[in-house]
Amino acid sequence: MDIIGGQHLRQMWDDLADVYGHKTALICESSGGVVNRYSYLELNQEINRTTNLFYTLGIRKGDKVALHLDNCPEFIFCWFGLAKIGAIMVPINARLLREESAWILQNSQACLLVTSAQFYPMYQQIQQEDATQLRHICLTDVALPADDGVSSFTQLKNQQPATLCYAPPLSTDDTAEILFTSGTTSRPKGVVITHYNLRFAGYYSAWQCALRDDDVYLTVMPAFHIDCQCTAAMAAFSAGATFVLVEKYSARAFWGQVQKYRATVTECIPMMIRTLMAQPPSANDRQHRLREVMFYLNLSEQEKDAFCERFGVRLLTSYGMTETIVGIIGDRPGDKRRWPSIGRAGFCYEAEIRDDHNRPLPAGEIGEICIKGVPGKTIFKEYFLNPKATAKVLEADGWLHTGDTGYCDEEGFFYFVDRRCNMIKRGGENVSCVELENIIATHPKIQDIVVVGIKDSIRDEAIKAFVVLNEGETLSEEEFFRFCEQNMAKFKVPSYLEIRKDLPRNCSGKIIRKNLK
């Protein structure tokens, strides 16, 4: 079944400009408070100018172009500008340092980079010291260094016509993007995403939160991440809604931005919810138009209830990963919600719980969450130049092994337990890090928490808790361990405690556990 009607991204934008014209498509707010607005017609023209810019720089169908940018209009221009010419976007996590950025450049075969002045010194060093195929760098800033092979993105773009000068044949099967996974435990892998994937993501995510053309979808998720692209941006544009892209998350500013732009849909991760709850309550907390708050794992029921009560919102749970493109398990529009379930499989997907021998398990038994989709259409196509890694997670018939553990009930509601790699083996027992973190997070003095397993010669692994306290609080080891003993089984109680100012996180808010010992 062809959900998208054979429509690639170039056709999508031409149609959107015709249908919605002067309706607001995109609003971008920078960290400095600068706001840029574009109608569907204006945004399509900016995308066309960007396509022409890339063509004048020698970019052709199949070429890879890296983007190392914070949330900004230029990211959107480049993303779809490359797609219109059949070239391939390689978004780089804006928080990555030299070694990781160089690795992605090398492994993606990117020949051109679009970035900003703050990241340029790093790429100067990469060009001098690392073997890459990089031929040219475009900077989004006005001021330019007097270096060869560097040009102004904005100046070049503004010199281009607003209609396409070059439009090669495109297919929905063409690769639109190679998105490298966050790599919290190992080197990132390049997830190959097609035009079909992105078009399907727009329709699916719009269905999931029942988007209409009068909706306003606001996000602070990074544009280089799958959530921003496929759950927010593609959904908003596919529905003809307004997409609000905020440069960076600020707990102090976020709720005001939701109110300012009259957002009807937004998305949150646990870190955002916890830091929002740490802000002083206001009489205006419930003065908003939010209909849905898309939510991604994982939160205790106490935290969820407190957040929903204070802000007068409800959470729409969505479970997925880069390889699934969208939240393939989640709450459905108009359907009942069953906390702490992560929901039921969405349309075009099947989901099962399987054992270590790849056999389906009955309701109530814990195993690996497996998803069936169509590679290159409803799930990712493959890992870039890595058939071995692809074969490890993706079966020939479209079953994807997520590496996550969970179970389902008799009505098809799924429940997330943990990442397999986050299960701690302690004296013959399997302990879920997420379960412990949800319990410990209910302590009134604790703002953030992660637990990890560390080697133990007697019990396989011991449990160590890393906590961040609320401002002005102190917490003794005696108080902490007493709380744990009162709220969890004895074998789950951590052996060690470390209080820190913050926890290492990647761009999507996930804890980088390999940095904690």
Curated annotation (Swiss-Prot):
<protein>
    <recommendedName>
        <fullName>Crotonobetaine/carnitine--CoA ligase</fullName>
        <ecNumber>6.2.1.48</ecNumber>
    </recommendedName>
</protein>
<dbReference type="Pfam" id="PF13193">
    <property type="entry name" value="AMP-binding_C"/>
</dbReference>
<dbReference type="InterPro" id="IPR000873">
    <property type="entry name" value="AMP-dep_synth/lig_dom"/>
</dbReference>
<dbReference type="GO" id="GO:0006631">
    <property type="term" value="P:fatty acid metabolic process"/>
</dbReference>
<comment type="similarity">
    <text>Belongs to the ATP-dependent AMP-binding enzyme family.</text>
</comment>
<dbReference type="InterPro" id="IPR023456">
    <property type="entry name" value="CaiC"/>
</dbReference>
<dbReference type="Pfam" id="PF00501">
    <property type="entry name" value="AMP-binding"/>
</dbReference>
<dbReference type="InterPro" id="IPR042099">
    <property type="entry name" value="ANL_N_sf"/>
</dbReference>
<dbReference type="InterPro" id="IPR020845">
    <property type="entry name" value="AMP-binding_CS"/>
</dbReference>
<comment type="function">
    <text>Catalyzes the transfer of CoA to carnitine, generating the initial carnitinyl-CoA needed for the CaiB reaction cycle. Also has activity toward crotonobetaine and gamma-butyrobetaine.</text>
</comment>
<dbReference type="GO" id="GO:0009437">
    <property type="term" value="P:carnitine metabolic process"/>
</dbReference>
<dbReference type="InterPro" id="IPR025110">
    <property type="entry name" value="AMP-bd_C"/>
</dbReference>
<keyword id="KW-0436">Ligase</keyword>
<dbReference type="GO" id="GO:0051108">
    <property type="term" value="F:carnitine-CoA ligase activity"/>
</dbReference>
<dbReference type="GO" id="GO:0031956">
    <property type="term" value="F:medium-chain fatty acid-CoA ligase activity"/>
</dbReference>
<comment type="pathway">
    <text>Amine and polyamine metabolism; carnitine metabolism.</text>
</comment>
<dbReference type="GO" id="GO:0051109">
    <property type="term" value="F:crotonobetaine-CoA ligase activity"/>
</dbReference>
<dbReference type="InterPro" id="IPR045851">
    <property type="entry name" value="AMP-bd_C_sf"/>
</dbReference>
